Amino acid sequence: MGQRTLLYDLHLALGAKTVDFGGWDMPLHYGSQVEEHHQVRSDCGVFDVSHMTVIDVDGTDATVWLQRLLANDVARLDDPGKALYSPLLNEQGGVIDDLIVYRTETGYRLVTNAATRAKVLDWLQLQRAGFSVDFQVRPDLAILAIQGPRAREKVAALLSPARAALIRELRPFEGVADGDWFIARTGYTGEDGLEIIFPGDQAVAFFNDLVGAGIAPSGLGARDTLRLEAGMNLYGQDIDENHTPLTSNLGWSIAWEPAERNFIGRVGLLAEIEHGVQEKLVGLVLEERGVLRAHQVVRVAGIGEGEITSGSFSPTLSKSIALARVPMATGDRAEVEIRGKWYPVRVVKPTFVRHGKILI
């Protein structure tokens, strides 16, 4: 038996099929993964993501400490509620984890992946020496992600007028604290939506309110196909400690300026650039019948081979799609080996669908 969120019994009551995910027993779907996927693209759905790790960071050195720890620069978060995405790198530039960091009134809040919890906390503790900084894990909090074009509208209708007004005013990648609730306009689906971090003892009642308002409970299966269509990396598949942001379509998340900010991994990344980045993360589209899966070999004629990192059937495109790490010189065509046979695939930018629009 794995760890369970406070909503586990409610998930079962709603008909969830559960699976192990990073040591947690989590809902895979509540009957139909494909229906949940389409519901989020067209309306909205709610995901329990309380298995993720919330870490509050405070102290007089909180900013300079995070400026050293993260590839992105928290100095860009000039107001409480502002958020940014960042890789957390090792000395060689490999990705220990990827996370969201929010500016709070007194410091910062990090939301990291569930499966990386132990190694992230060990890394933070190791890098704490010499800094006046404190960090606290918050297992008392629940996290619900309400995602889809009607998410903000439907959630606002359930809240007090004052809290609803805060939601309507939120810009993308901004959050706001309201009492013991923190509401952010962020997500992992490629749609508009909210991620709400709030006291766990209120989780069951609020989840029931959301479902009662017609917001579909949605599982990790739909979350995975939604994020894949959106070209969002999954830690442990598309990114890990053996690959850098430069080979993972995450170069945009590195803040190189100011040049004197010597964040952990900077030297390794600069060395990779100096020697020439050898690989890139691309999207693949299979035009024939079949399913692209992780670890299938990608062959690029006259250039070399790569590997699929994530692959699945796309409910929006009605085709199989994938993310793959391939040689840098790869053009717009390649082949994938499926059960001993080679199939042609189209190579595209690794973003297939965003905000309901097909981009390929």
Swiss-Prot record:
It comes from the Bacteria. GO terms for cellular component: cytosol; glycine cleavage complex. Keywords: Aminotransferase, Transferase. Its EC number is 2.1.2.10. One of its GO terms (molecular function) is aminomethyltransferase activity. It catalyses: N(6)-[(R)-S(8)-aminomethyldihydrolipoyl]-L-lysyl-[protein] + (6S)-5,6,7,8-tetrahydrofolate = N(6)-[(R)-dihydrolipoyl]-L-lysyl-[protein] + (6R)-5,10-methylene-5,6,7,8-tetrahydrofolate + NH4(+). InterPro entries: GCS_T, GCS_T_bac, GCST_C, GCV_T_N, GcvT/YgfZ/DmdA, GcvT/YgfZ_C, TrmE/GcvT_dom1. The keyword Iron does not apply. GO terms for biological process: glycine decarboxylation via glycine cleavage system. Belongs to the GcvT family. The glycine cleavage system is composed of four proteins: P, T, L and H. The glycine cleavage system catalyzes the degradation of glycine. PANTHER family: AMINOMETHYLTRANSFERASE (PTHR43757), AMINOMETHYLTRANSFERASE, MITOCHONDRIAL (PTHR43757:SF2). This is Aminomethyltransferase. It comes from Pseudomonas putida (strain ATCC 47054 / DSM 6125 / CFBP 8728 / NCIMB 11950 / KT2440). The lineage of its organism: Bacteria, Pseudomonadati, Pseudomonadota, Gammaproteobacteria, Pseudomonadales.
